[in-house]
Amino acid sequence: MNVAILLAAGKGERMSENVPKQFLEIEGRMLFEYPLSTFLKSEAIDGVVIVTRREWFEVVEKRVFHEKVLGIVEGGDTRSQSVRSALEFLEKFSPSYVLVHDSARPFLRKKHVSEVLRRARETGAATLALKNSDALVRVENDRIEYIPRKGVYRILTPQAFSYEILKKAHENGGEWADDTEPVQKLGVKIALVEGDPLCFKVTFKEDLELARIIAREWERIP
């Protein structure tokens, strides 16, 4: 059984909106509904768990009607806490693999879901990633230090893992920017799957405007 964990518990404070960004509506759908739709259509996914804050349960319940949705789980104050809540909920389902995705990355393709899961079956863990094409610098005390671009990737989601591996990685708590970090500390090789620029994370208002433009054509994008 392959289960997608859709993280939608963030507060979206950098967006400066009245509601968390995952619940902002673009082209008739809330942001979280775009990746959710991809998971529901994907033949590689058997079930979906949506993690959100308690005060948004009713909103999510009204928007979600599908047999693949296994449940809505209350998220924590941090990303890692939300992942652990989902893993605990999933114990009764005994999934083989779980796929973790940020709902603030609305434009998820089915081919990426399938490929990340395929690579995770080979190594135990895989993540979507994108080669960096920009100049990178580190700034300290007003001094700029250039970082070589070769071998530098942006880590994206979705990320897929053996359920048992991810559960073990989180069993001692800890706070992580994403889930590949604690998994790698177990000695598990992380497979990288090439993503594309459409996998961007909606963080600022400018990102939301770009998302609106893409959303108008999303159903036509293969």
Swiss-Prot record:
Q: Where is this site: Transition state stabilizer?
A: R14, K21
InterPro entries, sorted: IspD, IspD/TarI, ISPD_synthase_CS, Nucleotide-diphossugar_trans
Q: Which UniProt keywords apply?
A: Isoprene biosynthesis, Nucleotidyltransferase, Transferase
- PROSITE patterns, per the entry: ISPD (PS01295)
Protein's UniProt keywords contain Repeat:
no
So which domain of life are we looking at? Bacteria
Chain positions of site Positions MEP for the nucleophilic attack: R149, K201
Q: Does the keyword Nucleotidyltransferase apply?
A: yes
GO BP terms: namely:
isopentenyl diphosphate biosynthetic process, methylerythritol 4-phosphate pathway
One function term, GO molecular function aspect: 2-C-methyl-D-erythritol 4-phosphate cytidylyltransferase activity
Catalyzed chemical reaction(s): 2-C-methyl-D-erythritol 4-phosphate + CTP + H(+) = 4-CDP-2-C-methyl-D-erythritol + diphosphate
Name any GO cellular component annotation.
cytosol
Q: Which cysteines form disulfides?
A: none
Q: What is its EC number?
A: 2.7.7.60
This protein's pathway reads: Isoprenoid biosynthesis; isopentenyl diphosphate biosynthesis via DXP pathway; isopentenyl diphosphate from 1-deoxy-D-xylulose 5-phosphate: step 2/6
Q: Name one Pfam family in it.
A: IspD
Q: Which NCBIfam families match?
A: ispD (TIGR00453)
List the PANTHER family hit by this protein, alphabetically. Answer: D-RIBITOL-5-PHOSPHATE CYTIDYLYLTRANSFERASE
**Per its UniProt record, what HAMAP family does this chain match?**
IspD
Assigned protein family: Belongs to the IspD/TarI cytidylyltransferase family. IspD subfamily.
This chain's function reads:
Catalyzes the formation of 4-diphosphocytidyl-2-C-methyl-D-erythritol from CTP and 2-C-methyl-D-erythritol 4-phosphate (MEP).
Report the protein name in the record.
2-C-methyl-D-erythritol 4-phosphate cytidylyltransferase
Provide the species name: Thermotoga maritima (strain ATCC 43589 / DSM 3109 / JCM 10099 / NBRC 100826 / MSB8)
Taxon lineage: Bacteria, Thermotogati, Thermotogota, Thermotogae, Thermotogales
Q: Which gene encodes it?
A: ispD
